[in-house]
């Protein structure tokens, strides 16, 4: 661990070296943006629990770790290493290793005419005008130190452009792989997704880690939804237990848009998932759906900020948490209804299961309403597995592990049922299946003779 002063000096040295060689260092506007962002980070520093948006989460484990940029580390993966992360039915998968595009393992299947799926560094070099039109336009680096840090160290990530009136039927999968090193390492992937009016598409961000070691992935995604677009965004976090992950999704919605955000948090030591849609055009709809499952000493923080900035918009937030061991979860959901956003219809719900006496959840649904003709509700619940339900299943001849799995899956399926993209849902269900099996199998009430090996069967087969 190092002091705050030592950490700042380390970042100053890293930034000085980085900006000399970074992609786009010869573009005055980008150089100025990076410098302004780094100055802002130096000014505000890492957040503390005195900051209202971070009151439940202590990030000192990140702030006091001497991370070095992963840009000088490993950037290649063998096909064998990547095989566990291939997804059936997905023909377009960009692979990023330690924040940089790995071209060889990436897949670019046939896409509709005009659709562009590439990396940010390439776009900065070959088409800076299109990149400048949206990059950093919607993110508020004044409020968020991690977003400022990401902007300062922006170099690579995904760039996706969907032309007007285009339907992309297959999901566009973005796989981010962090690899361990002798020293703690950090990467700052930056993604820019622009969907023009009347287009439809699905995007997946998938975070994994290899090799062990302390890694930190600090990601920002800007998603621009043009008028009348229908978009789905999935974020899957399944890194190892020495990994830190801060992920920020900033969504800018135009008129009559329908945008869905799904988040599934399964791994990591400390994870912060920020989702911030702004309904900037009349008649927009937004659904934020999430599931977080923690065990051991995991810390999983979900911060949702939905801004209703125009009339006749609706939003829904549904988040479920399952926590065991000493895991700690956070749900902080804010809905802000601006003065002119009349006829707003907004709802947020957070439901949680605590499976041990040491598991914790902090939940704070929050409404800020500055208009007078609105319909807004919010609520949160915290509970445990019902003994009567478990007894009923056991009395029907279902073994204890399977009975617990069925009850946990029924709770998790509330979120799964909102995932409509076939290959993505099937993949996520498999991940949750394995995660909940381990959780049910290791429950304190399960006798040794009843503990079982994972059969790999689906939930329908178990039931």
Feature map (PLM): residue ranges:
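N-terminal amphipathic, basic helical "cap/leader" segment at the start of enzyme domains
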Residues: 1-148, 318, 323-324
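Conserved beta-strand/loop scaffold segments within soluble protein domains that form the structured core
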Residues: 104, 113-398, 412-448, 452-454, ...
